[in-house]
Amino acid sequence: MPDYEKVIEASGNGRYSKLNTVLGKGAYKVVYKAIDREEAINDNEITNVKVTRQEFKDLGHEIDILKSVRHPNIITFHDAWYNETEFVFITELMTSGTLREYIRKLTPLPNIKIVKRWCRQILKGLAYLHGHEPPIIHRDIKCDNIFINGAHGEIKIGDMGTAEMKNGKKYTVIGTPEFMAPEMYEEQGYNEKVDIYAFGMCLLEMATGEYPYGECTNAVQVFKKVTQTIKPECLSRVQDPELLTLVNICLTPEDERMTAQEILEHRFLAVEPEVVLVSKDMTMKLLTLQVVFKGMDKLSVKFEFNADTDTAADVVAEMIEEQVLQNCYQQLITCEINRILRDIARNQGPPDKGEDEKIVWRRENDIRSELERAKKDLALAVERVFEAEKKCELLEQHNIIAEERCKETIFALEQAKFQIPDLLQPQPQPQPQPQPQPQPQPQFQLQPQLQYLSPQSTTSPGPTSDDNSTNSTMLSSLESELSKLCVSGDEQVETTTHSALMENVLAGKAKYYEYSNDTSIDKFVMDTAGATNRSKDKQKQWAAKLQDQDIMTVGDLRDLHDEDWSGIGLTVFALRALKNMLAGKKAAVTQRGLQGTRSGASTPVEEQEQELM
């Protein structure tokens, strides 16, 4: 013991002594270094927690359980007692601190091999806890509560103070919000699978070095995202596809979530087996081989192999059929057996010619079967790549066509915007003549794809009493054609110009009243779909996606923040249509101003342009 370390307190039985070295402090506890005088070791820590005597009595059953927990990947709980106003307990000391502190020190982040090793140890500890009857739920799994011995890469689960045995479902809300499963916030209760959800968040932190939901500024935002099953932003920065798949498996709903033991058997955490030669007879024909799974709890598989009558492919297929081996190991173990046979043949010397031919034939047969299998896999991969390229080319063509049509539509609308206000200006009516000549009407020319204003309309004499209705009809035709183009553009092109154009058109076609907060979302979506010329199928799709987000009334829709709109899952066109429909009062004022202009009100040209936009 160094000179600066001194004993400041001893346990009631005299076995443990508390030193003056403080290892950590929390809101309710202080952790000191301690010595075990019976074992003569100082790799223990003593923790003082402020509790009442009654609370300590209530913890008696849990303390007895924690004392009985013994596993290489769980910090050992030695003893506990009540000391006046404090609950004191002795646990094993981990030299390198928490896993979170260790990850922060690493530059760059740990590689996949190290992450796999950590995951296996954490899952083994969880599988042990969940394997009790009834299961023990930790309820606060996070990298801050997982400890490491950096010299050996040893991982252990600690801070078992929140652990509890499960008889049926639990309802107590306890833990860290970023690592708490959605069911912990609900009234239906939860089980040991909340630890699997928290493990998924730990795996995410190991892979990215980022704290889950780091984009949130408070616990309320975290709660909202968790209950809406919105995953952390750092999930998009996971590079390894298999690791990403494993994280998503851990974050699935409770009834779909795998157990700790099942995740241990996932291919991402699987250790490649190795085939070793255990023994051989004098003739080198009868061999005893063994499949060894290093770093896993699986038992080794030992089997006999006759070099004269057996082939590697047949023996491995037989073991898979008898469920001794998993199918995913077939190719690897077959190659390993063939490697051992080649080594024996090379060291044995030149065999008889007949036997040599048999061995060569068997080896060639095995190689041919492996090549055929590889060819099939390659052909399938090439076919998938070809199909993906075709889809990409088709999407590019659709995007080009949609962009061209959108540009033409914008040009046509600009033409209409600058020509129609001149036609809408009130003109003096011509004096009646004895034999009036028919006034030439404005001419409009219909192009193959869009309707444009004919140049003649700008030079025609002053409009008659039917001119306003003709111009209105022309504008309606342009809006109708634009809506048709936007149906395809809604699914393929979402440029800034296109979105702004949709908003301007929708603002002129919206219903002219405000909706009350208790208006049903079905009624609101039906009006929006009707105003934008959308089909009933589109209406149902919009309503379904809103209701999936628990948006049942117009009031729920108004309560959404800007960042919440993007999480609904609708297209940009649909979101803008819904937002315009919410602004019904503004649209009504705009429409009344436009009607006043057409009936002869003296509105300036600039105001008319603003109304049309």
From Swiss-Prot:
Catalytic activity: L-seryl-[protein] + ATP = O-phospho-L-seryl-[protein] + ADP + H(+); L-threonyl-[protein] + ATP = O-phospho-L-threonyl-[protein] + ADP + H(+)
Catalytic class of the enzyme: transferase
Region listing for Disordered, in residue ranges: 424-475, 589-613
Binding site for ATP: 23-31, 50
EC number: 2.7.11.1
Ranges annotated as biased composition (Pro residues): 427-441
InterPro entries recorded: Kinase-like_dom_sf (IPR011009), Prot_kinase_dom (IPR000719), Ser/Thr_kinase_AS (IPR008271), WNK_Ser-Thr_kinase (IPR050588)
Domain Protein kinase stretches: 17-269
Compositional bias annotation for Polar residues: 592-602
Compositionally biased intervals (Low complexity): 442-475
Active site: 140 (proton acceptor)
Family to which the UniProt record says this protein belongs: Belongs to the protein kinase superfamily. Ser/Thr protein kinase family.
Free-text function comment from the UniProt entry: Serine/threonine protein kinase that probably participates as an intermediate in an intracellular system controlling nuclear proliferation.
The name this protein goes by in its record: Serine/threonine-protein kinase pkpA
Lineage: Eukaryota, Fungi, Fungi incertae sedis, Mucoromycota, Mucoromycotina
Gene encoding the protein: pkpA
